[in-house]
Amino acid sequence: VSIGIFAWSYLEPQPGQYDFAWLDRLMDLLYDHGVHVSLGTATASPPPWLAHRHPNSLPVTADGVTLWPGGRQAYCLHSQAYMKAASALVTRLAECYKDHPALAIWHINNEYGCHVSECFCDVSAAAFRKWLFERYGTLDELNRAWGTAFWSQRYGQWEEINPPRRAPTFANPTQQLDWRRFSSDSLIALGDMETEILRRITPDVPVTTNFMGFFKPADYRKWAHREDVVSLDTYPDPSDAYAAGQNAAVCDLTRSLGDGKPWMLMEQTSSAVNWRPRNVLKQPGQMRLWSMQALARGANTVMFFQWRAARAGAEKFHGALVPHVGTQDSRVWREVSALGNELQ
């Protein structure tokens, strides 16, 4: 079972004040009942105190608009304040649970880049220039590669270069391509930051993060070998006649990313999602069919989001194994239980 993924504000209610007592009880309870844990590092959603104390840690769009807390992933990919706080939390978690018998695998962050895959703030701009210098070495080479003679965009100093922010008309496509490469590398660097901490403290515990199929902002081919296990979140639309084929392709891609090694289906819904214009329920047997499809394409783990429907929050209407009322007398529960027994 996956736990702790969005628990930062409970694990660290105030800067440097950690409270793991509730997680201790949960880890012990799960182990006592024969359940092993995919433990999230909780870094995907910083608590409000981070932005309150470090407003420059918030991401900025190409239009110059700051994205404020209230959802998730409200952090700049290059914020030193975010990285310092995230590293400290991951270190404390690893030191606390390194010997816990329930710990089976680490789940770093969550769906990197899903909502914020790039940031256009001044800190990110400086990081972009550094990345470009390491890539090209000289301004002459950068000007040649970018074709900056067109529209009189030749650069004479590195400081003149900015991210492809909103401009009067079409941006330079080569600049945009390098920006996307840079942003992907920035996401990977955040993953490396957490992975290095965990491998230092818990070298025998595998590390993973959940990829999202054909997600373009991150170069999964470059990223996958950094993880011990490749994991996938997949949410095909039950109302789409082509969903089964698309899901098959996503599963095949995930297997190839791990060079044929077994991979984890970390997230799928047991019934319906809550974020489409039309949130169609899976038909009877469809959850089993798509789970078996993943297994046939190399997965050795089938998991779900989420265990019990949330009582509040942005995903309170998302499907779950157990509904709000808490009963196990439902078609979804019976189908998931049957699948579990079948896979045993």
Regions found by a protein language model. Give the residues of each.
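Carbohydrate-binding surfaces of carbohydrate-active enzymes
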Residues: 158-162, 200, 204, 213, ...
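Surface-exposed, active-site-proximal loop segments in enzymatic domains
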Residues: 6-21, 49-80, 170-176, 276-279, ...
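Polysaccharide-binding and catalytic clefts of secreted carbohydrate-active enzymes
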Residues: 53-55, 60-229, 233-247
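Acidic (Asp/Glu)-rich catalytic clusters
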Residues: 27-34, 95-101, 220-225, 253-260
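Acidic-and-aromatic substrate-binding clefts and catalytic sites of carbohydrate-active enzymes
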Residues: 8-21, 48, 114, 212-219, ...
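Short, solvent-exposed turn/loop segments enriched in Gly/Ser/Thr/Pro and often Arg
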Residues: 2-7, 40-49, 104-113, 211-216, ...
